[in-house]
């Protein structure tokens, strides 16, 4: 089973991404990838949320293997629910690193594309994971 990695603090998530020559996305990159061009509250629009993510109502209080729900229009899976995801962004107002996406233990509202929470980077949670991002070199137009 390919369940999401969880229970890593922000530093451990950063180190893992660095080792594979990637990085944590910023919260804005994360939201852009999650929305996949949508402007609605949820990236799936008016479709049944149970087709798109694991949350309190359908998760049976646990994570699930990745990729079982429908992807967004960019083809990215699990951008809502299953586990919250660390980002590389920091909010001075809360003193914490930004976490996005909602998890299996939250209501559907946590899966809104714009929803965020924060945590101190030293904390580990059984409902927070991460995904790595890769910087793509820009191509100069000549």
Question: Predicted segment positions?
Answer:
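Short, structured beta-strand segments at or near domain termini in extracellular proteins/domains
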Residues: 126-140
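Functional-site microenvironments in short loops/helix caps that host divalent-cation chemistry
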Residues: 1-126, 141
């Amino acid at each position: 089973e390919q369940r999401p990695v969880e229970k890593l603090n922000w530093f451990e998530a950063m180190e893992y991404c660095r080792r594979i020559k990637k990085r944590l996305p910023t919260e804005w990159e994360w939201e852009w990838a999650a929305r996949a061009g949508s402007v609605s509250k949820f990236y799936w629009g008016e479709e049944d949320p149970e087709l798109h993510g694991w949350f309190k109502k359908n998760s049976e209080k646990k994570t699930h293997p990745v990729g079982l729900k429908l992807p967004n229009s960019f083809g990215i899976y699990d951008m809502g629910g299953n586990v919250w995801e660390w980002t590389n962004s920091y909010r001075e107002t809360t003193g914490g690193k930004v976490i996005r996406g909602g998890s299996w233990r939250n209501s559907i509202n946590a899966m809104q594309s714009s929803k965020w929470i924060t945590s101190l980077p030293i904390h580990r949670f059984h409902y927070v994971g991460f995904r790595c991002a890769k910087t793509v070199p820009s191509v100069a137009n000549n």
